[in-house]
Amino acid sequence: LHLIEVNPRGGGDEISARLVQLSTGYDYIRGIIEVALDCFREPQITRDECSGIYYLCEQSKELFKNILDNHFPWLVEKNIQTLNLTEATGNYDRNGYLIYRCEFPRPLNDKIRKHGYK
């Protein structure tokens, strides 16, 4: 066992709170507070879906074709900062993102190909 990090916050970006809430219905922030106050209760999971984030950059531009001006049932949020795409070489190299929720693990590529562009 190796200690990697001790941190008073949840995971970065949208991953901890937003994606957990979308996938399971569980309030992750409330859970963190309950752990800190030593009153944590086992969560009641109300949803069993998949969610994720796709970051917009030069390498992922094909996934975003025709998504820019359209909305799809699986699309929770999109944030496009610029269409002057740059190549991602690190964690913060992105030009926007989209957040999705769907019923099956990792079907988004197929859904985008089917509904986003041909």
Which role does the model predict for each range below?
Residues 8-59:
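Active-site "cap" helix and flanking loop/linker of ATP-utilizing ligase/carboxylase catalytic domains
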Residues 2-5:
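Protein kinase-like catalytic core scaffold
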Residues 60-118:
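Long, Lys/Arg- and hydrophobic-enriched amphipathic alpha-helices
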